[in-house]
Amino acid sequence: MSRTTTVDGAPASDTDKQSISQPNQFIKRGTPQFMRVTLALFSAGLATFALLYCVQPILPVLSQEFGLTPANSSISLSISTAMLAIGLLFTGPLSDAIGRKPVMVTALLLASICTLLSTMMTSWHGILIMRALIGLSLSGVAAVGMTYLSEEIHPSFVAFSMGLYISGNSIGGMSGRLISGVFTDFFNWRIALAAIGCFALASALMFWKILPESRHFRPTSLRPKTLFINFRLHWRDRGLPLLFAEGFLLMGSFVTLFNYIGYRLMLSPWHVSQAVVGLLSLAYLTGTWSSPKAGTMTTRYGRGPVMLFSTGVMLFGLLMTLFSSLWLIFAGMLLFSAGFFAAHSVASSWIGPRAKRAKGQASSLYLFSYYLGSSIAGTLGGVFWHNYGWNGVGAFIALMLVIALLVGTRLHRRLHA
């Protein structure tokens, strides 16, 4: 007698057998399949953002070791997010053609290997090349994970599952910053990045093992004409271009604050250590709560109001960082992080329902704008820091958030007119 197994070769449970016999059934919350998807994508998000942002708290160290200005040092992060943004234009359509899981697994493995190789680079240009390859590789996870959830999870639970995925992103960003900051203080930055690379490699292997294969994936053509038609369709939508703008502004604000807050706090009167700068990433923990919470709140209040409220929380948190009290600054960072991850969770969960087809490409365009904001605003923030100090950086971030509120208001009115 043949033995029914799951996609990873493990014996299938009764629930798995039922799902296999009904291939069109969406995965619902509370089922073993939902737990596997949640754990797999949580670990993928964690590894992705640990790899991407591990250099952020050590920017002052890189400035000292390689004789760089803050703006030039920030390129080690900006080049990763820029290449990630460019890669999204290709990996989303690629996943539409060959499948979600193969693209994500390959991307995580390549990014982990490039991170380990970056610890062997002796020149700044060598480090930048590795960081560019890391960003390009991670583009295969960022948008495809969102698309996988929108395809495989029951529509009633997509916002909740997206919130859990984003919470994995927040923990990953926190872990990468925390490990690199503390390990750099006690050892050096090369050992710190090597530890993160090994951690991400283990996460990639676990992700490959437990993520179920796509059941609702239908391959589409990679012909340039088809890609252009879908691109035009997305940009003609009443809501998608505004969501793309939201991603640019939200991420640009978030990265700018965390890029330069460390420079500020290492100066007088605080003089905090590199380890403490890394510990500031604990502010990300609020994102692990606010992301799924925002997802559940959308069912009661709607996506527009929740996104606007979350953006307002970011603005209030930013204002608190303008004070000199270290406790007020950290409290402001907590609020800022909570608001960001909530707003991003809502915006990203809005993409799938709005896209009429080629959802992978739509998610890629959103995250292209998202990471483009990180690259452009993250580097421009260094100019404001150099010329105007933290007040200048705060004014720059506040301007982006006010524009985000205006865009969000227009989006809500347009889709509910």
Curated annotation (Swiss-Prot):
Topology within the bilayer: Multi-pass membrane protein
A Pfam family that the UniProt record links to this protein: MFS_1
Listed Gene3D superfamilies: MFS general substrate transporter like domains (1.20.1250.20)
Annotated compartments: Cell inner membrane
Spans through the membrane: 39-59, 74-94, 102-122, 126-146, 153-173, 191-211, 242-262, 265-285, 316-336, 365-385, 388-408
UniProt xrefs under SUPFAM superfamilies: MFS general substrate transporter
GO molecular function: transmembrane transporter activity
Record's GO cellular component terms: plasma membrane
Signal peptide: none
Keyword list, A-Z: Cell inner membrane, Cell membrane, Membrane, Transmembrane, Transmembrane helix, Transport
Periplasmic side: 1-38, 95-101, 147-152, 212-241, 286-315, 386-387
InterPro entries reported for this sequence: MFS, MFS_dom, MFS_trans_sf, Sugar_transporter_CS
Region: Disordered, residue numbers: 1-22
Residue numbers on the Cytoplasmic membrane side: 60-73, 123-125, 174-190, 263-264, 337-364, 409-417
Family from the record: Belongs to the major facilitator superfamily.
UniProt name for this protein: Inner membrane transport protein YnfM
Record organism: Escherichia coli (strain K12)
